[in-house]
Amino acid sequence: MEFDVVVVGAGPAGSVAAWAAAEAGCDVLILERKAEIGVPKQCAEGISARALEEVGIRPDDGWIAAEIERGILSLPSGSKFEVEVEGYVLERRVFDKWLVVRAVEAGAEVELLAHARRALLDEGRVVGVEYEGEDGVHEVRARIVIAADGIESRIGRTAGLVPQLEPDHICTCAQYEVVGDRYDPKAFMIHFDPERIPGGYAWVFPKGENRANVGVGIRGSESSPGLALKTLDELVEGPLSELVAGTPVEVNVGGVPVCGPVERTYGDGILLVGDAARQVNPLTGGGLNTALICGRIAGEVAVEAIEEDDTSASFLKRYQDRWEEEFRDTFECAREVAEMLPELDLKEVVEFLSSVENLEEMLRTSGILEDVWWG
């Protein structure tokens, strides 16, 4: 088999890239290791209105669980501060599949239960993918491979672009979807508590009036096996009990890369996108907004390369130039703050924030909560 573009991974980044390429007339194949797209869910499901607008997606009631108008910062003292934020909380299992359907309607093909094993190389150039399907091992050739295969990215690693993750490069996360009756359906909340949540924070993202995603993320250097879920249980039973009382109907645990993007997200015949490229905010762990926008850019650059018959690294570098223009400042600022946090006395930081008379105005002008949402 041979295609113009092979996309490995049917998450939002890969699906948007495939959609863009197929829409422009490219022959596209999506390889997805799961039997069902969109499960298990991997995040708090928040997305900014700006991200959807940038990739040309109109909000659809079929996959929007809540429309957000405000962001709230909660401190251990009980103080809360809020700013206006425009965005949505999604039903990821519906949204992710919706994106793949759009790609298929544009002409892309999809193969499920296709486990990518490695990038196929010819004198250092990526020329396809080896994968294991239901009926054995196969090779598929491509003019461009878009690696959207997640945090460990076998394709990126075998292409020599993705280094091994260290423990402090990962934020370990645990999240419940809770059914209850104490949620403000128009506001998400970030709870900052360095004593209970070292190197991280907790969140509450409403999914309507009686459901919410309640989770916690802890930087890997501060974590240990099972700590994220244990911490979440303690928060739900303790300081957050008045806000998140209810019954869990789903639990998810996982990891998010918080080391910042890999040095090169392109090579001869290959582009990296989403978690595979580690295009995740190093401070907040937010990556859904960047996945959509970088996925769209990757698809567009793949089309340009095929039209120009030039899939060299020097041509594909324009992909990195474009997504860095969009996110460079945000990522650099986030990385600097994340690197500075371990050197701070976080108890003093909390005390300082609690004492600031005009903290809401400071949050509004600094854009901190918007950046958490923007991810």
From Swiss-Prot:
- Name the residues that bind a 2,3-bis-O-(geranylgeranyl)-sn-glycerol 1-phospholipid: G367
Other remarks in the entry: Reduction reaction proceeds via syn addition of hydrogen for double bonds.
- SUPFAM superfamilies recorded for this chain? FAD/NAD(P)-binding domain
As for family, the record states: Belongs to the geranylgeranyl reductase family. DGGGPL reductase subfamily.
Task: State the function annotated in the UniProt record.
Answer: Is involved in the reduction of 2,3-digeranylgeranylglycerophospholipids (unsaturated archaeols) into 2,3-diphytanylglycerophospholipids (saturated archaeols) in the biosynthesis of archaeal membrane lipids. Catalyzes the formation of archaetidic acid (2,3-di-O-phytanyl-sn-glyceryl phosphate) from 2,3-di-O-geranylgeranylglyceryl phosphate (DGGGP) via the hydrogenation of each double bond of the isoprenoid chains.
The protein's name: Digeranylgeranylglycerophospholipid reductase 1
Please name the Pfam families in this protein's record. FAD_binding_3
Q: How is the cofactor bound?
A: Binds 1 FAD per subunit.
Swiss-Prot/TrEMBL keywords: FAD, Flavoprotein, Lipid biosynthesis, Lipid metabolism, Oxidoreductase, Phospholipid biosynthesis, Phospholipid metabolism
Domain of life where this protein originates? Archaea
Annotated GO molecular function terms are: FAD binding; geranylgeranyl reductase activity; oxidoreductase activity, acting on the CH-CH group of donors, NAD or NADP as acceptor
Q: Which GO terms describe its biological process?
A: glycerophospholipid biosynthetic process; membrane lipid biosynthetic process
Which Gene3D superfamilies is this protein grouped with? D-Amino Acid Oxidase, subunit A, domain 2, FAD/NAD(P)-binding domain
Under the heading NCBIfam families, the entry gives:
GG-red-SF
